């Protein structure tokens, strides 16, 4: 603890009631948030002279101030603790990295509604199903609905402006309601069947379709009978894949696993006896590395901090924690629903539990192995470059454009544990000659390292540039102009064969040219980072180019600003459909007069 903090004086005035405590460092940064049944007893445990875990000792050494909030009971303390953790994300708490809202399947309103993925507030008029553990789980369900019932999933703006069926109709994934090729009542029946599937009533749906198939066959409507037969076959195949033997209710199976270096929580979501999907979580491990602490922290953040998430009737867990009764009470207070947490289970439920444990163990092992793999490559690179120790931060830059159009520079960052995606950056390049990669790189590096000079960001140990001597020399010029401290510059250029494994490398002033063997771990690291920079630049360039092409044609029209351009494109479903529209059709768009429609039409057909 710091010199200004006196634990004895603090504890002498500390309450013995339930509450929440907050620990701060000398710069008033929040380090840790905790709750306690008895604040004085809990806080006293931090200042014992023996028996402290290393991470707890590291936390205590930084404490300069402790604040407490007394609560009426433990439940209130847990609710306040979770609120503070979610808001401040203290570095010594166990934190869920992925705290995004879970996705739902959304069924829109109207005569021919669409199914889509939805996140966030439920403001749109329609019906919501879920939440699902991941967007991937939703895509699987939507794909099945397309194959089985051929319900539409296109955007409304696209749907409203179709004049002929799209490719989805040709491959039997949609019945083309956009051009009237299906009756409303037939489509409504397909939607009703889709809803039955999403609600977990697959058995009732299969029985209903079987009855309809027999009726169609008895009236010699063999085409309809064959269609129903195919639907039943698809549904039964999915039922076999997704069913949990012996399961009929709503259950989340949660397993936590901790190893030196990390933790993993695996969640399997079962609704109506059907597996909606599963997901791995890798919480940031704080001062507590006990598996029960990880489980308790996960359940608190997952269900208490995010009350919009779907709550099953039961949780099956692989470890128990003394806070579970308080957690159940907090959930009951928030949701008005009772939750059962089961640990000692038998039969099928025990197999579910073991499956979750196995997945958590394997996922964490794979993650740690990948970290070790990347770390070994960093060590190999240090050996190749004759460094005293492996670099901790490597930045790579690349440029992407289409004949000089929509030029974008990318910056990706890697450390010994892998990519640091929160530090990735893209730079939209402006004011340079089209296709001048040197000028584009100069601008990107200048913008990046000017911020560093102003005290923003971190200095990399190695700067990797995708290019040869010219790009490397230009990078050196930028660093000299900005008086950036010495750092290692590494250029990577395609070799004479332009094949992977034959790259030519240039170090610092480009005078040092060398190659590495194709099986060199150091070369593999360079290739990995270069390819990631290339991918990141291309995706940014394509997005920028697409946006430019969608709007640039309308930018010269007086009276059509950014908002009106967006509204026009949304109304017609894109620039191509707008180009096909007549003056009268354009004038029917919201906010467009006949005179403005004439200007827009003339601009679109000026060539």
UniProtKB/Swiss-Prot annotation:
<dbReference type="Pfam" id="PF08459">
    <property type="entry name" value="UvrC_RNaseH_dom"/>
</dbReference>
<keyword id="KW-0227">DNA damage</keyword>
<feature type="domain" description="GIY-YIG">
    <location>
        <begin position="16"/>
        <end position="94"/>
    </location>
</feature>
<dbReference type="InterPro" id="IPR047296">
    <property type="entry name" value="GIY-YIG_UvrC_Cho"/>
</dbReference>
<feature type="domain" description="UVR">
    <location>
        <begin position="203"/>
        <end position="238"/>
    </location>
</feature>
<dbReference type="GO" id="GO:0003677">
    <property type="term" value="F:DNA binding"/>
</dbReference>
<protein>
    <recommendedName>
        <fullName>UvrABC system protein C</fullName>
    </recommendedName>
</protein>
<comment type="subunit">
    <text>Interacts with UvrB in an incision complex.</text>
</comment>
<keyword id="KW-0742">SOS response</keyword>
<dbReference type="InterPro" id="IPR004791">
    <property type="entry name" value="UvrC"/>
</dbReference>
<dbReference type="GO" id="GO:0009381">
    <property type="term" value="F:excinuclease ABC activity"/>
</dbReference>
<dbReference type="InterPro" id="IPR036876">
    <property type="entry name" value="UVR_dom_sf"/>
</dbReference>
<dbReference type="Pfam" id="PF01541">
    <property type="entry name" value="GIY-YIG"/>
</dbReference>
<dbReference type="InterPro" id="IPR003583">
    <property type="entry name" value="Hlx-hairpin-Hlx_DNA-bd_motif"/>
</dbReference>
<dbReference type="GO" id="GO:0009380">
    <property type="term" value="C:excinuclease repair complex"/>
</dbReference>
<dbReference type="InterPro" id="IPR035901">
    <property type="entry name" value="GIY-YIG_endonuc_sf"/>
</dbReference>
<keyword id="KW-0234">DNA repair</keyword>
<keyword id="KW-0228">DNA excision</keyword>
<dbReference type="Pfam" id="PF22920">
    <property type="entry name" value="UvrC_RNaseH"/>
</dbReference>
<comment type="function">
    <text>The UvrABC repair system catalyzes the recognition and processing of DNA lesions. UvrC both incises the 5' and 3' sides of the lesion. The N-terminal half is responsible for the 3' incision and the C-terminal half is responsible for the 5' incision.</text>
</comment>
<dbReference type="InterPro" id="IPR000305">
    <property type="entry name" value="GIY-YIG_endonuc"/>
</dbReference>
<dbReference type="InterPro" id="IPR001943">
    <property type="entry name" value="UVR_dom"/>
</dbReference>
<dbReference type="GO" id="GO:0009432">
    <property type="term" value="P:SOS response"/>
</dbReference>
<dbReference type="Pfam" id="PF02151">
    <property type="entry name" value="UVR"/>
</dbReference>
<dbReference type="GO" id="GO:0005737">
    <property type="term" value="C:cytoplasm"/>
</dbReference>
<dbReference type="InterPro" id="IPR050066">
    <property type="entry name" value="UvrABC_protein_C"/>
</dbReference>
<comment type="similarity">
    <text>Belongs to the UvrC family.</text>
</comment>
<dbReference type="InterPro" id="IPR010994">
    <property type="entry name" value="RuvA_2-like"/>
</dbReference>
<keyword id="KW-0267">Excision nuclease</keyword>
<dbReference type="GO" id="GO:0006289">
    <property type="term" value="P:nucleotide-excision repair"/>
</dbReference>
<keyword id="KW-0963">Cytoplasm</keyword>
<dbReference type="Pfam" id="PF14520">
    <property type="entry name" value="HHH_5"/>
</dbReference>
<dbReference type="InterPro" id="IPR038476">
    <property type="entry name" value="UvrC_RNase_H_dom_sf"/>
</dbReference>
<dbReference type="InterPro" id="IPR001162">
    <property type="entry name" value="UvrC_RNase_H_dom"/>
</dbReference>
